[in-house]
Regions:
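Mid-to-C-terminal "cap/lid" subdomains and adjacent gly/pro-rich loops that border
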Residues: 1-84, 155-161, 180, 184-197, ...
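Intrinsically disordered, low-complexity regions
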Residues: 29, 39-43, 51-52, 78, ...
Length: 294
């Protein structure tokens, strides 16, 4: 129903972050350059580096997403990390395993994920507001996955490519290493990535939880379709914008009666580590920050 994420923040040793440009004058200059020339800091969305990875051996598809932002601040921009250098960065770290079905398979069955949300719609007049219960982090697998994601993020910034750039860790802080310490950090800092979806899921008419069919038509209702992220039957293990655009284009073809050409009949090939059942990576990192199991 939604993705959670946590901000892993660091001080930066070189003047390469956005932190000095957050005042009103700097924002105005950035905006003016973009309006006039289409260049400068205003011409980027600033999430230009990121990646998907598997949290452990036995997971076939990536279940961890990390992307970098060149300043450490809260989602609404009101709180900026205090650093000695005046520069910072943060990694947006998410464990994006789709609950109960879909994108992750393992050689041995994973424990069932029970962090499934629910919503209530009442019809009594006047209808009260809908009730949505996201039920975040109600399964131990979610805690394990987020701990692994934070430790992987630490491994990334510990590599030689970041030498001379990354300073002290701001959050969760160098002292947070045990499961209990990381869990406390997660309790205090996890927040929504604002990726709600799946409340109007696609499926066969015999599926009691399905609302629409493969063409977006609402079961049992004539002349009504739903074409948005709510019809995803499972949560994609990444951001929703690209899948939603793909869904809308496909549904538009259905509505217009267009048939896909033959060369689109098969999905693009994807690479999967042939040894995914027994290893999490091809080789160990140059510097390893964690000696235990992810």
């Amino acid at each position: 129903m939604d993705h959670l994420e946590v901000y892993h923040q660091f001080e930066v040793s070189k003047p390469v972050s956005l932190q000095p440009h957050l005042n009103l004058l700097a924002k105005g200059l950035i905006g003016a350059e973009w309006l006039v020339a289409g260049s400068g800091l205003g011409a980027t969305n600033h999430f230009e580096a990121g990646g998907f990875m598997r949290s452990r051996a036995g997971v076939e598809w990536p279940d961890v997403q990390i992307h970098f932002l060149p300043v450490a601040l809260s989602y609404d921009g009101t709180t900026v990390a205090e650093t000695r250098t005046g520069h910072s960065l943060q990694m947006h770290v998410g464990y994006n395993r789709s609950p109960s079905r879909g994108f992750v398979r393992a050689s041995a069955p994973l424990p069932p994920v029970t962090s499934n949300g629910a919503g209530d719609l009442m019809t009594a007049p006047p209808p009260p507001p809908p009730v949505v219960r996201f039920n975040y982090m109600s399964d131990e697998e979610d805690w394990r996955g987020f701990r692994a994601a934070v430790r992987i993020a630490r491994e990334i910034v510990a590599q030689p490519a970041f030498d001379g750039l990354i300073g002290p860790e701001v959050t969760p802080g160098a002292a947070a290493h045990t499961d209990a310490e990381l869990d406390q950090f997660l309790v205090e800092h996890l927040e929504s990535a604002y990726h709600p979806c799946g409340t109007c899921r696609m499926g066969a008419a015999r599926d009691k939880m399905a609302v629409v069919d493969g063409g977006g038509r609402v079961h049992g209702v004539d002349g009504l379709r739903v074409v948005d992220a709510s019809v995803f039957p499972t949560i994609p293990n990444g951001n929703l914008n690209a899948p939603t655009i793909m869904l809308a284009e496909k549904m538009a073809d259905h509505i217009l009666g267009r048939a896909l050409p033959p060369d689109h009949a098969q999905a693009a090939a994807t690479w999967i580590d042939p040894e995914w059942r027994t290893r999490q990576r091809e080789r160990p990192p140059v510097r390893k920050q964690w000696d235990g199991e992810f």
